[in-house]
Amino acid sequence: MTKESPIPVVVNGAAGKMGKEVIKAVSQAEDMMLVGAVDLNPKYRGEDAGEVAGCGPVEVPILDDLQSVLVLATQEKVQGVMVDFTHPDGVYDNIRSAIAYGVRPVVGTTGLSGEQIKDLGEFAEKASTGCLIVPNFSIGMILLQQAAVQASQYFDHVEIIELHHNQKADAPSGTAIKTAEMLSELGKSFNPAKVEETETIRGSRGGITEENIHIHSVRLPGFIAHQEVIFGSTGQIYTLRHDTTDRSSFMPGVLLAIRKVTQLKSLIYGLEKIL
């Protein structure tokens, strides 16, 4: 029995906090091979990606040109994968570039609009190229979302609070948006109005989805990624909470996504769809 070729992986955002964790995880995975690393921070240009990540040399330099690195992922026997943890401003173009090169994107960068995701889905399907957009790679968060969907069948009042580090660029988080979307799929409207509300300070009640779910965003140093889904009814409060205390907790989900995306020919949104 011949051993299958490892999956070529490009990490975009290689010098970021999540990018470093991905480099460590991919370097240790027997069925994967790090072939490229990209980061726009000039401080790390030419540095060994493994040294920057803190896992020792991997003989892959960090470059600042995504397209030239994507070419490296197309030169192997197996279709390559790009893992993207960059910035909301550039992620849409990153995904389109990867698909255009036949490299399958696994995207943890949040901030994409619904219209952008729809457009990328059409682009990926036309190219018969798999793409995974995952707001949260934590298995624990997926379990929380599933529990929230079950609870929402019995509660009419719900609000979401998401708490992240103060370097996060988008709000609310992709995870909170995804959670609200999952609750909305039941086809019910939440939080029927009992009183006419007045905000003394604009935005005090958070953002509101079309289904009337309030989402509140907290940005403070010390947090990594946390979320509460709070249900209320007469005489009771039901709270679901998930806390990420170390980014390494995302890596089993990232590695699973890398393996699964090689089998896809279209875009899938959400880790729960491949579990």
From Swiss-Prot:
GO terms for cellular component: cytosol. The active site is at 164 (proton donor/acceptor), 168 (proton donor). Keywords: Amino-acid biosynthesis, Cytoplasm, Diaminopimelate biosynthesis, Lysine biosynthesis, NAD, NADP, Oxidoreductase. It holds the Pfam family DapB_N. GO terms for molecular function: 4-hydroxy-tetrahydrodipicolinate reductase; NAD binding; NADP binding; oxidoreductase activity, acting on CH or CH2 groups, NAD or NADP as acceptor. CDD domains: DHDPR_N. Its EC number is 1.17.1.8. It catalyses: (S)-2,3,4,5-tetrahydrodipicolinate + NAD(+) + H2O = (2S,4S)-4-hydroxy-2,3,4,5-tetrahydrodipicolinate + NADH + H(+); (S)-2,3,4,5-tetrahydrodipicolinate + NADP(+) + H2O = (2S,4S)-4-hydroxy-2,3,4,5-tetrahydrodipicolinate + NADPH + H(+). Its main location: cytoplasm. NAD(+) binds at residues 13-18, 108-110, 134-137. One of its GO terms (biological process) is lysine biosynthetic process via diaminopimelate. Pathway: Amino-acid biosynthesis; L-lysine biosynthesis via DAP pathway; (S)-tetrahydrodipicolinate from L-aspartate: step 4/4. The keyword Amino-acid biosynthesis applies. It comes from the Bacteria. It is found in: Cytoplasm. (S)-2,3,4,5-tetrahydrodipicolinate binds at residues 165, 174-175. NCBIfam families: dapB. Catalyzes the conversion of 4-hydroxy-tetrahydrodipicolinate (HTPA) to tetrahydrodipicolinate. Belongs to the DapB family. This is 4-hydroxy-tetrahydrodipicolinate reductase. It comes from Gloeothece citriformis (strain PCC 7424) (Cyanothece sp. (strain PCC 7424)). The lineage of its organism: Bacteria, Bacillati, Cyanobacteriota, Cyanophyceae, Oscillatoriophycideae. The gene is dapB.
